[in-house]
Amino acid sequence: KTINETLESDDINQQLFAVELIKDLEMDQWRQTLNKLLLTDNPILQKQILLLAFNRKSIIDKKVLIQLSNQKNEIGALGITFLADDNIREEKKRLYNNINSSDTHISAASSVAILRIEPENKLARKRLDEFLDVKDEDSTAIALDYLKNSSELLTRDLLNNLLHHPSTKISKSALNVSGERLD
């Protein structure tokens, strides 16, 4: 009860503290509150909850995920990464239109999502390859972050090159991706 009250507090610092407290606990008892908080207009809190739920995606309601994934910002991109394959198929047209978004997070997350259900999709592959071509360190690092759970979309050779890239930002992001691979 106390944690739930803290999560529902009007103080962002208390809410973030409560999110930190529950990170290693079973979260089902706070599911309703966490979903409600995801619909607030606080991107810091939304991001922390999404990162907390990354390996426990079942605590986030499908309707909330769809709503979040419609945002044109980093929160929307994180929401896209949570979508199950059947949701990606349902949202395919919108995600396909997002591939050329000016928001790097939305474009990268949408490209990866489309490639999860259509590995041969040329437009999504072209866009992802553009990100991985390291013309812009930030864009490449962002794209790598969205490949964490889809590392099969990245060849071993390219991952190895990115691990040894002179940019710390890129090599760190590549290391995060490689930690998810089994090959």
List the model feature ranges, each with a label.
Residues S107, V112-R156, K169:
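Solenoidal tandem-repeat scaffolds enriched in leucines and small polar residues
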Residues T2-T6, M27-L39, S58-S69, I88-N100, ...:
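Amphipathic alpha-helical scaffolding segments comprising HEAT/armadillo-like alpha-solenoid repeats
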Residues S167, A174-D183:
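Short, intrinsically disordered, charge-balanced linker/junction segments flanking boundaries
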Residues I22-L25, L52-I59, L83-D86, I114-E118, ...:
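Residue-level signature of the C-terminal ends
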Residues D10-D11, D41-P43, Q71-N73, S102-T104, ...:
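Short inter-helical turns and helix N-cap capping residues of alpha-solenoid HEAT/ARM repeat scaffolds
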